[in-house]
Amino acid sequence: MANAQLRRGQTTAAIRSAELALELDSLRETAWQILIRSHTTAGNPGSALRTYQRCRQVLHQQLGTAPSPDTRAALDGLPG
């Protein structure tokens, strides 16, 4: 649902949906990716970067792994 909302330009709804998905399963990288892209699309690069950092921390603590290349690629739209 969050991905469809983001495609329709409904960034606030996409952020809420992705956050809800992460409350249910914090290891779901696709939800992290959508949340990062939603913040970027909404013009909030700081929030996108903080979201990525939270994702990285959760994955490291829970699984001992780093975010996937797809999750890192979600940051590609950030300035600078």
Q: Regions from the language model: what does each represent?
A:
Residues 1-80:
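Intrinsically disordered, charged and Pro/Gly-enriched terminal/linker segments
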